[in-house]
Amino acid sequence: MPVSLAVCETANVVNAALRESLGGGGGSGCVAAAAASGRSGSGSSSTAAAAASADEAKIGDPSATDNLQSQIVANAKRVLLAKIEYEEVENYHESVLAKLKSKYIVIKPDNSGAANCSYKTNGASTGKALSSNGHDNTNGVNGSSAATVNGNRKQTVEQSNQNSTTNPNELPKPKRVLYPRENIRIGWKQSDRKWQVGAGMLNVGNTCYLNSTLQALFHIPALANWLVSETAHVENCNISESCGSGGCIICAMAKTLQTTQSNQTAVRPFLIYTKLRQICKHMVVGRQEDAHEFLRFLVEAMEKAYLMRFRNYKELDQLVKETTPLSQIFGGYLRSEVRCLSCNHVSITFQHFQDLLLDIRKADTLEEAFDGYFSRERLEDMGYKCEGCKKKVSATKQFSLERAPITLCIQLKRFSMMGNKLTKQISFKPRIDLSRFAARSPAASTQPLSYRLVSMVTHLGVSQHCGHYTAIGLTESGSYYNFDDSYVRPIAMQSVCNTNAYIMFYELDVASSSINSSSSCSTSVPKLNGLRLNGQHSPSVATTAVAATATSTSASAVSPRFIGPQLPNGYANNNGHVLGAAKTSIQFKSSPQKQPQQQQHNGLLMGANKFQESAQSKHSLVGSLHKGETAANASANAISNANSNKSSCNNNTLTTNSQHQQQHILPISSDEEDEDEDSDDDVDVKANTAPQLPSMPKMFEDAESVAQTAKLKPKTPLKSLVPYESASEEEQEQQQQQQQLLVSPQLQPANPRKRRSGADSSESEDEPPSIMRNGHAKSNGSGNESSTSTSIKSNNNKQKTDAIDEIFKSLNNYKNKHRATAAGTTTADADEDEQQQQQVTKKPSNSSSSLISKNGWQSQNGKAPASPKTPPSPAVIKSKTGIWQITRTDDDNDDDDEDADEEDDADADAEQEEYDDEVVVVETTPSITTKNLNNPFASKPSSADAMPGAKRQKLLNGSAKSAQTPRVGNGYQSEATANGNAVSELLKQTHRGYGTSVLSWTGKTSDLDKQSFDLVCAKRIAGYGDMDGSVGVSSDSNINNSKNIDSNSNIKSLTAPTLLAEAREQRKRDAEDDEENEMDRGRQRKVKSASVKSNNGIPGYNPFQEFESQKRWNGNKSGSFPRFYQNYRQNFQQRNKFKYNRFGGGGAKFQQQRALQRHLAAGGGFTRRQHQSTGHQQQQQQQQS
């Protein structure tokens, strides 16, 4: 009887097995063996001794039984080093050891005896054998084993020819399957429940990566169906004890999915958020993380939670662990072939993957990235050790798909190790075919690999450390939705394909795969690279496919295998491929589908995008399939979603099919059904005039107005989408159409704007144009004429008079406009009168003034120059104090311009170009109050006269200033300004909001409030200004007297050319500071240089800082005048406190003065101690000079 025992650490079981086997050999031997094992320290030693005694007893030596103990003691060393060979017993006490099979291996010795130390391996064995020293010897691939004989370790290699059925070139099969691949339900229709769009998720603090990843996972049909099927586990989950109070991550995912499906408002995924440290230890709550990193840790945590359901999950091999539901859904196998360039030896290995990381640095499309990933690459020279050559050689390596996953996860490598982001646009399609990348095996070559985009994760930002994550998911209705934290909105197919995707999830398209698999006349259940379609979930798929194959007819006897977009059943393309003549009428009572809208141009069918959108990708927002309908309709619906192939599909057939599909999916009655069946063959090609929900806001209104620059406000409460980096092609087309309308409005057709496609259209009614393109309301009129009537006339109208007459004419025009704006009446022509009245009446009551710009502002979307006949509408700026309208002023208001000479005057043209962009402010108050030009808020006119010898100096705001006497001081104290300190002026302006004219710190007006150029010239000629360009402060009487200026006054002959030359120089200086002349809308002003606008003689003077300094240093009674220096920094004395006494030795006072001079030359200020010692000396020196 062969020895049969179970390997165990305890010696009792071993001794019992030995006694049972050696029962017939002699009781003394058994007793001796038991005694020896009782005194032995280890079970293995007693086993070896008992086996040796048993062998001697079988030989028949009579002294062996009597002297068994003495022989064991004498040969203790040989017994300890001896090895016993065993082999597995298949049916040994199966009823007894049934519960112990997972812990014990049943073995038996070899008949050749213990003398032969080499043993043969069994192909069905587990590859483990127990040696005499208690260690396991693991068999290799070819059956190599390590045997120990007489203390020497000897390696013997022997190949097994009996059961060697494993092929190294084929994927090994796991010994145990934890979750069958056939149980995975693909597609939303495979589930018994109704799937909603899903609620949004609240951002609880930098959790956009978590929300977007969960939304993308929840919109994968295979994963969602599996999570819903885990209800029994969720109810009886006992993993919470081992995982702590957090519980199972699979249960948390299932509960979160149920919450998003049942709630209508945004939910808070606290079940996942609280397990963040359980998912990944280094992730911190509230910190920004990478979405792909979180995805990998989340899937790994779910796999670990599933393996914990099995008691011996730690002892499972890697192949068994790769049969979990998560691995069956996301997992696949890559075949790596390394070919030696010397001996052409090919080494094949298999690699399990759950996502593909594609390099996009050299790719512009997703197909190019796939080609680069699966292309043959050359390993570095002499860097691969070939198994055939046994040396390092050059080789090539290539990947291929051995087993394609059910859900393909693709990550685009957009981030570098330094955190920088590659923001290039990668174009992709909602359907991809990976058949050309499959391994060339008989099972994989005949089956297509068609995938459909189900969800994706996008990243908005410029680097890995900042930005925002959003998700896009495909719902059961076939529409894509954008999930931006708590905001959920539908998104068009064009926007989806133009998104800078980061992570994409593609799922196997069962419908198209079943169509192609049925074309091979196989009546069995189709398989997809080892994936068997679920017959129990969709039994009508195979039946419909077989019936379609039986009734199909082809032009050729043997049609080649066709990979790519297919037409629905009953329609053939121009190549003769008939996918099925069976007529299937899909009638959805509450889920009408939408076909992609085709644009007709000259009888040709043109796609609105690079590819035609699938029929199933356009579904209704609220429609759904009733569960009472047959599965045949559902399968036929899945079959009918095919793209149009522009190389082999007839355009007219496509359009007819599109209309036919639309008629059958809309709700119809029985009479209408009969009529549709009679008119199947002759369906008129017409546009889709009834777009269904979901709808997006329309870009333009279906109105017949000409050159309308207003964008309608949509009635749908949906907010605008997150702006992506590239606009879609449809948006570019609409922008081009808008540009054409602006350039040539007289050639506009009756209906210039086409309605967008179904998911991009809106059902809102036409509204009057009341919203400008910049988002602000119009204030100058309700119609198109009012929007363009206030704009400037063509700049080609030249000045017809000489320079002197033009100056006075401009002054008269300024006075006429000022009077007309205030009183509501004007003395100009009727057109100008109507324009001025519209500007006054359309203004709201809270607006105090209107900005009038000569150059005008173009609209935000204006890319082409406007037509001279139809200038663009003026820009409108909305502020707290009202609505500001930027319009243009007319310089030729009088009728005298039309009767003037037609010759162009060069000086007048130059002058016109110089102040063409002048900006003036016109008050619209009922009464006119002449104010001080330097300080309009002053109650009394300023009495300060202009200094005759002052030079003109241009500041940042472009205003002129009067020169002042240079002062010497400590840098902290200053006299008050002529019109009061800076704080009092600021207090007077506290009621004014953003967008209004704001005075400078010194009380002077900004560029938007300064006087017009013609008034300045008129004042200079009238004698109220200096000839060198400086302008004094004029009082109210001076301004009133300037109205009665006689044009025939005595003026020097060189006055006009001098003024024009100065005006040209001044306008050139003003043009360089256009950035500083812009209106303050609440943004921070940009200062080009370090100098600040001031009223003092030093460029770095700041009156507001001076006022603050007076409160701190008012105790200084030195009586010195303040003096500020450029680049003065606050608290500079703290840094340079001991700078004056850093020089030692003789001549300390001279060194101190030299250091002070260098300090002042560098732009620093006085320190406190230097001020006390040197203030009076500098004052005296300057007074003497």
UniProtKB/Swiss-Prot annotation:
Ranges of Acidic residues composition bias in the record: 670-683, 891-920
Pfam families: UCH (PF00443)
EC number: 3.4.19.12
One GO CC term on file: nucleolus
Top EC class, one word: hydrolase
Alphabetical UniProt keywords: Hydrolase, Nucleus, Phosphoprotein, Protease, Thiol protease, Ubl conjugation pathway
Region (Disordered): 126-174, 642-804, 818-975, 1056-1122, 1136-1185
BP term (GO), one: negative regulation of antimicrobial peptide production
Annotated positions of the Phosphoserine modification: S552, S554, S726, S728, S867, S873
Record field: compositional bias (Polar residues): 126-169, 924-942, 959-975
Bias-annotated ranges (Basic and acidic residues): 1062-1071
Extent of the signal sequence: none
Phosphothreonine: residues carrying this PTM: T716, T870, T925
Biased composition (Low complexity): 642-658, 778-797, 836-853, 1151-1161, 1172-1185
Ranges of residues in domain USP: 199-509
Keyword Phosphoprotein: yes
Catalyzed reaction equations: Thiol-dependent hydrolysis of ester, thioester, amide, peptide and isopeptide bonds formed by the C-terminal Gly of ubiquitin (a 76-residue protein attached to proteins as an intracellular targeting signal)
Family recorded in the similarity comment: Belongs to the peptidase C19 family.
Function in brief: Required for maintaining multiple types of adult stem cells, including male and female germline, epithelial follicle cell and intestinal stem cells. May function as a transcriptional repressor by continually deubiquiting histone H2B at the promoters of genes critical for cellular differentiation, thereby preventing histone H3 'Lys-4' trimethylation (H3K4). Controls selective autophagy activation by ubiquitinated proteins.
Subunit structure: Interacts with atms/PAF1, but not with CycT.
The protein, known as: Ubiquitin carboxyl-terminal hydrolase 36
Gene: Usp36
